Amino acid sequence: MSTSHDRAVLNQILNPLMPTSDSGIAEIHLESDSLEHPGYELSLQLEREGVALAEGVRLDEAIEKFTKALEVCPKNPSAYNNRAQAYRLQNKPEKALDDLNEALSLAGPKTKTACQAYVQRASIYRLRGDDDKARTDFASAAELGSSFAKMQLVALNPYAAMCNKMLAEVFEKAKTGED
């Protein structure tokens, strides 16, 4: 007889692309960034304006807003993360990497910003063909609960995906009584 935890672990093995929260294994609850800095609230407002501009594909203006947000509060990791996204969209990966490294140095280890920055940085590494660095960052993001990072880790390991598929087929046949 198996326990619910045993079934959850087995489900993770058989369904590697399923987010852990759907499998019965406890989900990691990430912290939000919060700073004790007099300019933090204004920085957040400028950052929201920058995000709106970026969504409207006004990337130069968005970068200006993110830069202003960082001038007001230079320790705001999410502003670095968002500016990095705008740089990525402008095909400026070096600037994006600089901002992502700064975001990761400022963000707490279990924050949403850290998770997002790891995914962004890993994506840049993957595009460059540096799968080892990509794998490391995707693993960090996956540990923080990113289902996208988890999918990328499986994609970077075709043998794991093949083994999981074979195991799923064997267990399905065992369930239905097929040989």
Curated annotation (Swiss-Prot):
Q: Which GO terms describe its biological process?
A: tyrosine metabolic process
On whether Protein biosynthesis is a keyword of this UniProt record, the answer is no
Q: Which residues form the signal peptide?
A: none
**Sequence ranges of the TPR repeats:** 43-76, 78-110, 115-148
Q: Which ranges form a coiled coil?
A: none
> What InterPro entries does UniProt report for this protein, alphabetically?
TPR-like_helical_dom_sf, TPR_rpt, TTC36
Q: Does the keyword Transmembrane apply?
A: no
Identify the domain of life: Eukaryota
| Keywords assigned | Repeat, TPR repeat
Family matches, as SMART domains = TPR
Task: Note the Pfam families from the entry.
Answer: TPR_11 (PF13414)
**What protein family is recorded?**
Belongs to the TTC36 family.
Q: What is this protein called?
A: Tetratricopeptide repeat protein 36
Name the gene for this chain.
ttc-36
